[in-house]
Amino acid sequence: MTIGLEHYLAVAAILFVTGIFGIFVNRKNVIVILMSIELMLLAVNINMVAFSTHLGDLVGQVFTMFVLTVAAAEAAIGLAILVVFFRNRGTIAVEDVNVMKG
């Protein structure tokens, strides 16, 4: 039995639904929401690599590497902002993030 395109698409769909489920179930913690969004982005990247491999084209795989690089940078910046926010406010609850003033 070989692993085909359908298997990769099923795994990506499960990851994407898990990410959506994580966002809807836990709306109070910003870190869990950020991790759920990253999980959804990972599912999209798995789809791009699977279709790229299935079609025999490397462009999707190269584009996925760029997307993963940008996603790592945005996750690092997002966590740094959350650390600074926690130091100033003492909490990272979603309802407290809405009352920020510039």
Curated annotation (Swiss-Prot):
InterPro entries: NADH_UbQ_OxRdtase_chain4L/K, NUOK/Mnh_C1-like. One of its GO terms (cellular component) is plasma membrane. Its EC number is 7.1.1.-. It catalyses: a quinone + NADH + 5 H(+)(in) = a quinol + NAD(+) + 4 H(+)(out). Keywords: Membrane, NAD, Quinone, Translocase, Transmembrane, Transmembrane helix, Transport, Ubiquinone. Belongs to the complex I subunit 4L family. NDH-1 is composed of 14 different subunits. Subunits NuoA, H, J, K, L, M, N constitute the membrane sector of the complex. This is NADH-quinone oxidoreductase subunit K. The lineage of its organism: Bacteria, Pseudomonadati, Pseudomonadota, Alphaproteobacteria, Rhodobacterales.
